Amino acid sequence: MKKLVVIAATCALLGSATAAWAAGDAAAGKAKSATCTACHNPDGNSTNPQYPKLAGQSADYLTKQLMEFKSGARVNAIMVGMVAPLSPQDMEDLAAFYASQQIARSAADPALAPAGQAIFRGGNLNSGVSACMACHGATGAGNPAAKFPALAGQHADYIELQLKAFRAMERANDAGQMMRQIAARMTDQEIKAVSSYIQGLQ
């Protein structure tokens, strides 16, 4: 219980932080996005569930991820090549473009949604899993100031991959190791259920 309180308090503190980067130019970002479309589609709504939807995501969060792919703080064999030629301004512009797009909504698996909702809204007190909504909001809209991503409508497969990557310590660019600590306490079934619920959030 104490760990849950600490995580929630950390979320609140980070939520008061100001954005670290200036806003980019969405029109310039659209002009620079041709390479991105192969995986993420022209409007940022990827149809391959292994690749994230970028549409509607916080610009600050997207910029942070691009910068961390480039610095090596976040590791992905495909993205490291994609970000290599990008300047900080390019990253801000691309982030602004995708943030300006509308995410395409999807449906949750009705067999998994109830268990997923329980984890998303209440966590698991017995195992110390914090409620997802503590940092990502009740509707999954995220917290742009803290660079906590919007989750609603994201591919369930992608969410599941990322939670398992955090759990395996293969992804390590989360603030204060929060996601690694939470994912480490989650079962495969909890991960699958909450990922499906998130996909169906409107």
What name fits each language-model region?
Residues T47-K53, M67-A111, P144-A150, R167-L201:
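Axial heme c-ligation environment in periplasmic c-type cytochrome domains
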Residues A27-A34, A59, R121-M133, A152-L161:
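Sequence context surrounding c-type heme c attachment/ligation sites in exported
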